Amino acid sequence: MPRELTEIKEFLLTARRKDAKSVKIKKNPENTKFKVRCSRFLYTLVITDREKAEKLKQSLPPGLQVKEVK
């Protein structure tokens, strides 16, 4: 089931959870979507600023599997 997150801090806390398996990054011309798969929900964060998206990509936990979809 999907859930949408609005805060970057909330997304980072979710990505650091034990049950977080992978992150998919979808880039569109106007926004970037970060999707983290946990055991129960698929959490989505939409960012319109490219610089913030790059910073968030760098600050993802190192143990997660990251896949970029274009």
From Swiss-Prot:
Example of a GO cellular component annotation carried by this entry: cytosolic large ribosomal subunit
A GO biological-process term: translation
InterPro entries: Ribosomal_eL38, Ribosomal_eL38_sf
Source superkingdom: Eukaryota
GO molecular function terms noted in the UniProt entry: structural constituent of ribosome
Keywords: Ribonucleoprotein, Ribosomal protein
Similarity comment: family membership: Belongs to the eukaryotic ribosomal protein eL38 family.
Protein name: Large ribosomal subunit protein eL38
Organism: Timarcha balearica
